[in-house]
Swiss-Prot record:
Protein name: Transcription factor bHLH53
Alphabetical GO biological process terms: regulation of DNA-templated transcription
Subunit structure: Homodimer.
Pfam families reported in the protein's UniProt record: HLH
Gene behind this protein: BHLH53
Length: 291
């Protein structure tokens, strides 16, 4: 049993004295099945005296432990099977100038102060239970406030760097905007203008204007001569109101004229004096008769 106790404390790297291995302030509870024998001391008194014949010999050592002990060290007792009748209060095992005794490893103890030591050369990392490590403090820093509004494009700072437009550029933009608006309106007036691009629409607009001028002249001539029945006038008005017929006539660069009026034009002296006009009128009449 003494070898077991010594081998436990000699696992440390530095040499440890047995008196340093004693644990003061340890709450020990000795079970009824264990017994301990110590050297007699005047100040220690037990309720039951040790018998002289059961006292351990001071010259008895374990052969294995002899090499670790000096003659000045304490002697470890040999325990017997003697049983104490009652549990003794061992609080009187406090640090004293006298050497202390080691007890059997089968005792029970309170683990709260298990590694406390009064020896200043023995470092106990778990003894000082009142030590509280200081919490790590970090320097406080303030996070800048960011705007939650998301702006697409240039920000407020970019507005100051935006180049200013000259008066000529502003006027040119205004002209282009007005041209685009007028072109859109013109496309609504020309028959089939929504199917044309800008260049084709301008050409169709020029032809449509010529068609309107010619058609208006024929209608005025019909009113002055007052030739033709009312049915012809109504039929002519009905045809000219159609957008499809206007688109067809303007594309072919012709106008609508009643057949009776064409026949009357052949008898006019002014037309007969102009061979080109007379020739065109004869072609129209020949086509009409062929149909």
């Amino acid at each position: 049993m003494s070898m077991d106790c010594l081998s436990y404390f000699f696992n440390y790297d530095p040499p440890v004295q047995l008196q340093d291995c004693f644990i003061p302030e340890m709450d020990m509870i000795i079970p009824e099945t264990d017994s301990f024998f110590f050297q007699s001391q005047p100040q220690l008194e037990f309720h039951q005296p040790l018998f002289q014949e059961e006292a351990p010999s001071q010259t008895h050592f374990d052969p294995f432990c002899d090499q670790f002990l000096s003659p000045q060290e304490i002697f470890l007792p040999n325990p017997k099977n003697e049983i104490f009748n009652e549990t003794h209060d061992l609080d009187f095992f406090l640090p004293t100038p006298k050497r202390q005794r080691l007890v059997n490893s089968s005792y029970n103890c309170n683990t709260q102060n298990h590694f406390q030591s009064r020896n200043p050369n023995f470092f106990d990392p778990f003894g000082d239970t009142d030590f509280v490590p200081e919490s790590c403090t970090f320097q406080e820093f303030r996070v800048p406030d960011f705007s939650l509004a998301f702006k697409v494009g240039r920000g407020d700072q970019d507005d100051s760097k935006k180049p200013t437009l000259s008066s000529q550029s502003i006027a040119a933009r205004g002209r282009r905007r007005r041209i685009a608006e007028k072109t859109h309106e013109l496309g609504k007036l020309i028959p089939g203008g929504n199917k044309l691009n800008t260049a084709e629409m301008f050409q169709a607009a020029a032809k449509y204007v010529k068609f309107l001028q010619s058609q208006v002249g024929i209608l005025q001539l019909m009113q002055t001569t007052k030739k033709g029945s009312s049915n012809v006038q109504m039929e002519t008005q009905y045809l000219l109101e159609s957008q499809a017929i206007q688109e067809k006539l303007s594309t072919e660069e012709v106008c609508l004229v009643p057949c009776e009026m064409v026949q009357d034009l052949t008898t006019e002296e002014t037309i007969c004096r102009t061979p080109n006009i007379s020739r065109e009128i004869n072609k129209l009449l020949s086509k009409h008769l062929a149909n």
